[in-house]
Swiss-Prot record:
This is Uncharacterized protein C29A4.17c. Its main location: membrane. It is found in: Membrane. The chain crosses the membrane at residues 63-79. It comes from Schizosaccharomyces pombe (strain 972 / ATCC 24843). GO terms for biological process: autophagy of mitochondrion. Belongs to the FUN14 family.
């Protein structure tokens, strides 16, 4: 008899698959922010990932430098013993030619850079999600220096 009096709409409120929200609690989708509009979740994730990436980059970077130096020293040693011949002028021309092409100040036909399309994209990249980016890059620097 009570089920008839309560009605279907009233019982629907107590259905077990309906999400329960308290008046003073935030939903899971709500971002946690302070009065300064800082997203603490993004800051935490950015700093954690940045620290790990910086530490790994520092360790792997040193390993990469040591490996490249060992390969270069081995090639130079084998070349000095006469087992292989390296045409250094041709190699230098092949490496430096493309480098000068990309690092030289070759302006487009208009005589200046296209800054109108460059600066808005840089500004948009910096301004979107700054909490994550600032914490990521600062923690990456700390991880890189401490490795």
């Amino acid at each position: 008899m009570n089920c008839l009096l309560l009605g279907r709409g009233f019982l629907h409120r107590f259905h077990p698959f309906r999400p329960v929200l308290c008046e003073d609690s935030a939903s899971a989708a709500t971002t946690i922010t302070s009065q300064f509009k800082l997203n603490y979740r993004q800051i935490f994730i950015g700093s954690s990932l940045g620290l790990a990436a910086g530490f790994a980059l520092g360790k792997l970077g040193r390993l990469f430098i040591v490996a490249c130096s060992a390969v270069f020293a081995t090639i130079a040693y084998i070349n000095s013993k006469g087992l292989i011949r390296i045409n250094w002028p041709q190699l230098q021309q092949q490496v430096i030619g493309p480098t000068e092409q990309y690092t030289g100040f070759h302006f487009p036909s208009s005589g200046r850079f296209n800054t109108q399309s460059t600066f808005p994209t840089i500004r948009n990249w910096i301004c979107t999600n700054p909490n994550f980016k600032l914490s990521f890059f600062s923690a990456m620097y700390v991880g890189f220096v401490s490795s």
